[in-house]
């Protein structure tokens, strides 16, 4: 039966430009099938720009209650959606071009004779699908399974799914089931009906919980504009990421150019493919003799050839060492991934206890086996947002930036390597040996047993050796240390100790001074020079607590005393030693302290004497100061 306004003789053979645009709108819009009103009546809901319901009836002619259909005299996007999505008609199929269909054509459409029939795997008995919680087990999802509400392929769309727990076990998008629940206006305690088997699907409360948890799977990269090719830099201008059109070399591995660099013809020797958005497949382009770029728009043929092209070229996707370096996570009994709604978006199955998940840089998580197989054999990017995992240019830069602190020069590399040598722990008195320039006397720094603030320049390089986390021995790399350590330390240090009183004393309070040596200068002549050893004692303000910090404070002196000391310091020779002894709380007798110090100094000298000899340095132009820090033994 013909409806008014339609003539049977009007048959279309070719796809018009306007109808093609409406088909593009239908395929790119978010439209949901809420209800089927007979075999040819459908209630649709469009998500954007606002949720609106539309009724579509197939017949002769087709009818839709939208505002576009009666005005244009052309099929609207809602009718196109039913023909292309619901009934899977090809865009150029004759039945998809007509303003209406006869009874025979509708009958063929309902029977699906235009589809390629594939054998369906046999279903097992329902009792074999019942799990411990009383639910039906979820059916395996294959490449042809679709969501009955949005009519999208499940494995291709990669959205979280739920399944019918009391009927057929088929999977449907969680988002689509929530839209259907809103249309049915059911209460939270009610059960939803399966749109496929018409049996109870699942409690609405469970669907809402799954929807809440699945929304947490959305990463920030998914919200980026599609014209941003995430993870892909331009190999010429280093723009990262490339925006707009992105060109990929068909012969070089992971070589990309932005629009500006491609127009500058900086890589003319090879051919390129291109894409405008990261969710699109790479399309071929050719250059004619007049150097005008010609785009090939045969989309279906190109998409088929692209996979064969990649296999033919033998392109390596993600290297194994890159994939194995991605973080792994073991699912434990307290993991949030066990909650309803969390699932691997590649296989669309829930996570289970004891499984391993792999985390991508974009924060998406998948089963380890699923994502490894994807990166090894299918694509070098995240299957959800398209962010490229590995690019030789960005990976090389990241590796260089990670070791940037070790570069600059060979001298700096050697200097840093010496500072990072393993710590040597020696119990006993800490020594600080440092080199001073000619004419400059060493000062008494404020000692911090955790870290000594000393200048670090390549010219004054030194080695750090930590002793019991108390202080550091700073050694200059010169020949003088090899010649003077054994003699000067063994000669000056014991003589100084021999001049001290040998009477035993008990525990010295931390705020008690040693008066016999406070204002006394002890001169110890040697065979080489006559060094002046100035003994200064200070009040210890700390008790070796958490930070193990000891602050040295100079005693107050009269102006006359300072002048005399300054005059004596001005006459010091470069080989002189400035020996400063700081005692802290101790509980041993002086004789025991002396023997302990001698034993530790002997071991230190034997260790220091084995230090490698560097380039020759004039010993007369240097001054070595010895600072002895008293520690609690």
UniProtKB/Swiss-Prot annotation:
Zn(2+) 1 binds at residues 234, 237, 258, 261. It is an enzyme of class 2 (transferase). A zinc finger (ZZ-type) spans 229-280. Its EC number is 2.3.2.27. A zinc finger (RING-type) spans 147-198, 344-388. Keywords: Apoptosis, Metal-binding, Repeat, Transferase, Ubl conjugation, Ubl conjugation pathway, Zinc, Zinc-finger. It comes from Homo sapiens (Human). Expression is testis-specific. This is E3 ubiquitin-protein ligase ZSWIM2. The lineage of its organism: Eukaryota, Metazoa, Chordata, Craniata, Vertebrata. One of its GO terms (molecular function) is zinc ion binding. Zn(2+) 2 binds at residues 249, 252, 267, 270.
